[in-house]
Regions:
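C-terminal boundary and immediately downstream tail of ABC-type ATPase nucleotide-binding domains
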Residues: 221-242
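ABC family nucleotide-binding domain
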Residues: 1-220
Length: 242
C-alpha cells in the first residue's frame, strides 16, 4: 500500500531524513514516534507530497509520489491528512468545509456532497453542528471535523500528524475514539503521536525515529515489551514517566 525505499531529504546542507525504508500494508495501523525534530512529521508529509524529498522512492498503491507526472491533487484526495492545527476554513460552515473539496476535486454534485458530509458528521458525533463555524467549536470537535473532511474524499489511507497535541487533555479521548473506530474498520493509517496508550491499543506496528532515521520498526507487542533499540528504550522510559 505505502512503500518507502531509502527516502532522504535535505534542507540546504541539513539532512532531515536519512535512508528511511518501511512498508505499510493495506489495513495496517502504524504509529510513528520519536523526540522533537526527529523527522516524524516530515516523513509522513512526504507520503502525500506535502514535502519533497531528494533521494529514494515512495509509492502509494502503486503510484510514485515523486514522479513529475503524478497527479498530486488526485494523490492527496486518496491519502487523507489530518494536522495538529485542524486546518479548517474559518469563513465556511462545518458543512461547507466538508463539501468544498468533494465538489472541486471529485466533481460531486452539491446535494451528493452534502449527503456525504452529513453522513460523516453523524459518524463523528457532530450532526448538530453542521451549520456552525469552526471557531464556534471546541478543539476536539474541530479535529473530528477535520477527520470527517478527510474521509469525505473516500481515501485509501489516512495520515495523522500529532492530531491530539494541540488539544486540552479532556478533549484528547474524543479524537482518539474516532481514530480507533477507523482502525477497527480497516483504514490504513500512519499516525505521528506520543499517545502511547493509543499505540498499544490500536497500532500493529511502531516506528521510532531519531535524528532523521528510522531507528526502530517492529510489532507493537515487541516495542512495548523488551525487544527494542536502546535509543527507543530511552525515549519510551521518558514518555511513560509522565
Amino acid at each position: 500500500m505505502i512503500v518507502l525505499d531509502k527516502v532522504s531529504k535535505w534542507y540546504g546542507d541539513f539532512q532531515v531524513l536519512t535512508d528511511c525504508t518501511t512498508t505499510v500494508q493495506k489495513g495496517e495501523v502504524v504509529v510513528v514516534c520519536g523526540p522533537s525534530g526527529s523527522g516524524k512529521s516530515t516523513l509522513i508529509k512526504c507520503v502525500n507530497a506535502l514535502e519533497t524529498f531528494q533521494q529514494g522512492t515512495i509509492t502509494v498503491d502503486g503510484t510514485s509520489v515523486g514522479d513529475k507526472d503524478t497527479d498530486l491533487p488526485k494523490l492527496r484526495s486518496r491519502v487523507g491528512m489530518v494536522f495538529q492545527s485542524f486546518e479548517l476554513f474559518p469563513h465556511l460552515s462545518i458543512l461547507d468545509n466538508l463539501t468544498i473539496a468533494q465538489e472541486k476535486v471529485l466533481g460531486r454534485k452539491q446535494n451528493e456532497a452534502a449527503d456525504k458530509a452529513k453522513e460523516l458528521l453523524a459518524r463523528v458525533g457532530l450532526s448538530a453542528h453542521a451549520n456552525k463555524y469552526p471557531l464556534q467549536l471546541s478543539g476536539g470537535q474541530q479535529q473530528r471535523v477535520a477527520i470527517a473532511r478527510a474521509l469525505a474524499m473516500d481515501p485509501i489511507a489516512m495520515l495523522f500528524d500529532e492530531p491530539t497535541s494541540a488539544l486540552d487533555p479532556e478533549m484528547v479521548s474524543e479524537v482518539l475514539d474516532v481514530m480507533t473506530e477507523l482502525a477497527r474498520e480497516g483504514m490504513t493509517m500512519m499516525c505521528v503521536t506520543h499517545e502511547m496508550g493509543f499505540a498499544r491499543k490500536v497500532a500493529g506496528r511502531v516506528i521510532f525515529m531519531d535524528h532523521g532515521e528510522i531507528a526502530d520498526d517492529r510489532p507493537t507487542s515487541e516495542f512495548f515489551g523488551n525487544v527494542r533499540s536502546p535509543r527507543a528504550d530511552a525515549f519510551l522510559s521518558k514518555i511513560l514517566q509522565h
